[in-house]
């Protein structure tokens, strides 16, 4: 059984994590404390119940934020480099994969992309990322063109 949930810890309080202005104050005072509390509580609860190994937790965004600060003390949309957190689901804890350059502008080591994240999730769910599916005309389509990250 695969259950999936998505959430926004900021609810209807405004800009969510889209911090085009006042980035640092919003993150420090409003957004990161409840995120930290919720994420750590989820991992600990699953660990205590013996469910962490069978539950994959993925925390990510649809894009990163610019390395440079804009005129409104915020950061704008930026797909060049961003962070993803994996926990549980057979992932070995306490590891870092990849590294950005010194200004956070682009990957410097072990670059990966969305297709690799998809492949990693499929792998954790026991689904072969290279599995072929067929369209209505019986044309083969790869489920994913990425490779699972070596996190297991």
Tell what function each PLM region has.
Residues 1-152:
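Ligand-binding pockets and gating/stacking loops
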């Amino acid at each position: 059984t695969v259950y999936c949930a998505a959430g926004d810890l900021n609810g209807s309080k405004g800009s969510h994590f889209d911090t085009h202005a006042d980035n640092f104050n919003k993150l420090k005072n409003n957004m990161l404390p409840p995120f930290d509390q919720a994420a750590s509580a989820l991992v600990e609860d699953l660990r205590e119940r013996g469910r962490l190994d069978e539950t994959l937790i993925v925390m990510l965004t649809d894009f990163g934020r610019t390395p440079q600060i804009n005129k409104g003390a915020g950061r704008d949309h930026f797909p060049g480099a961003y962070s993803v957190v994996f926990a549980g689901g057979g992932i070995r804890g306490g590891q870092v994969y990849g590294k950005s350059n010194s200004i956070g502008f682009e990957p410097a080591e072990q670059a990966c992309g969305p297709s690799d994240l998809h492949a990693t999730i499929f792998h954790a769910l026991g689904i072969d990322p290279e599995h072929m599916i067929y369209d209505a005309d019986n044309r083969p389509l790869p489920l994913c063109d990425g490779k699972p990250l070596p996190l297991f």
